[in-house]
A protein has these predicted regions:
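Hydrophobic, aromatic-lined core segments that form the binding pocket/scaffold
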Residues: 1-166
C-alpha cells in the first residue's frame, strides 16, 4: 500500500508548488493553446471558445463536481501512457504536464456539458475524453507543439498547473 493517497499527495503538492493564487488567465491560455491548433472537428475550437467565455461559471462549477475519483483514474491513465513513452526522449516533465493539462481540459468539457444539459452521463464523459484525445493526442503537430511549449509557456509552469488542480 502507498503511504499517501492521491488526494494527500495532491494537497501536499499544491501547498508546495502554488505560491500564488489560481490565475484564470493561465487556464484561458491553456484552452487557447488547444483552440488554436488545426482541428479535426470544426466544432472543437467552438467548444473550447465557449468554455473560455464561461470560465467564471465553469471553474467553480467544476470544483463542486464529485468526480474526483474518475479524474484520478484518468490522470493515472495519462501518466502511465506517457511516462512509459518518455524513456525514449527522457522528457518526463513534459509528460507529467500533459497529463495535468489533459485532465484539466477534459474536466472543463465535462463541466460545460453538465451546465448545458443539467447532468453528465458516462456516455458524455467518454465522448468528452474521446474528443480531447482525437484533437490533441492523435495530432502529431499538436503534441509536438505541446512538448515545445512546456519549456517556454508560463501557463505550463508547475505553479500554473498546480493552480489548475486546486
Amino acid at each position: 500500500a502507498l503511504p499517501y493517497r492521491a488526494e494527500d499527495f495532491r494537497r501536499e503538492a499544491l501547498w508546495e508548488l502554488s505560491g500564488e493564487a489560481f490565475d484564470p488567465g493561465m487556464l484561458n491560455s491553456l484552452l487557447s493553446f488547444f483552440e488554436s491548433r488545426e482541428p479535426l472537428d470544426k466544432a472543437w475550437p467552438v467548444r473550447l471558445a465557449g468554455i473560455r467565455e464561461n470560465l467564471g461559471v465553469l471553474v467553480p462549477f467544476r470544483m463542486l463536481s464529485e468526480d474526483g475519483e474518475a479524474y484520478e483514474r484518468l490522470i493515472f491513465y495519462f501518466l502511465f501512457r506517457y511516462l512509459l513513452a518518455s524513456g525514449e526522449d527522457v522528457d518526463i516533465l513534459s509528460k507529467i504536464k500533459f497529463a495535468v493539462a489533459a485532465v484539466t481540459v477534459i474536466s472543463l468539457l465535462d463541466a460545460q456539458t453538465r451546465l448545458e444539459t443539467g447532468g453528465l452521463s458516462l456516455e458524455n464523459r467518454v465522448e468528452n475524453a474521446r474528443a480531447f484525445s482525437s484533437e490533441a493526442e492523435y495530432s502529431p503537430d499538436t503534441m509536438e507543439d505541446f512538448w515545445n511549449a512546456c519549456w517556454d509557456e508560463e501557463f505550463l509552469s508547475f505553479s500554473s498547473l498546480a493552480g489548475f488542480c486546486s
